[in-house]
Amino acid sequence: MSHAVARRQEFAADNLAARKVGAEPLIEGLKRIHGAAPAFDSYWRSEVLPLLNSGFRPPIAEGFNRFSRADEIARVIDKQVAHELAVGKADPYDTHPSLRERIAALEGFDRRGETRDEAPAVSLLTGVEVLEVDLLRTMSAEAGNLKPIQWQDVATAVYLPLWTQAAEWYADAFQGITLEHLPEAITQENGIASRLRPKEGEKLDADRRKAKAIFVTGAALSVLLDRHGWRTSVQPGEPVLLEHDSSIVDPFDVVGALAKGTMTAEAWRTLCATAGISALELRPASAASSPALE
């Protein structure tokens, strides 16, 4: 009974909002909420938490705006909204009506003359950074000690150090491998995966070993290209990209594609030749003997 009452209250609130600001802005806002809400968990886990765990505090609201506008994420959000509009139905235990039901209840409003303001809702707030710090303090008392960081700086300050650490830990797995021979090294039985020595307490079955090999090889490739003057870009919702002149490489995607066979060795070698990186050695030059082998 209480859930049914809550749903009626939501309909009443929607009716009031439509009379105050117009049905069209309300409908568009509801669509954005229903599309973006499922995406926020992915944004938080994949984009925000790695920075918080490294001691940095990015602009969270700004980052989610970027994340939700990224091409692939925007397609997923649009698909989610389309699904809700097509088959969405409230469960008896839901406190809110479905998106389809809420929009249907607004169809009777006259939308002529309504104006649309495309500014995000966060623009109505002042002191967003302070509010974000307060939010983080509800999760950890140490939130005030986090260093502010802008999204354009996360590659250099956070990810490259993490990738360097991973590449150097498993450096011996890359011994003698140049980039032109990466296709064989990532696919052959005696390649990179077989050379990985687990850390203390780490268990690597065949699948985990393969996944680990793809990740650490992508990390090593990222570090290598960055140290040879490539520009590294890590933005919310976007793939990792390294760029130099007209060449663009998504290191983790490329290594995964080579491992799965969806990118041919010939295509990779052509890319390497064009970029002049064929002879570069994958093993980090700064690495001593791998700690995993000591």
Question: How would you describe each model-predicted region?
Answer:
Residues 1-6, 11, 15, 19, ...:
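Cytosolic-facing loops and C-terminal tails of multi-pass membrane proteins
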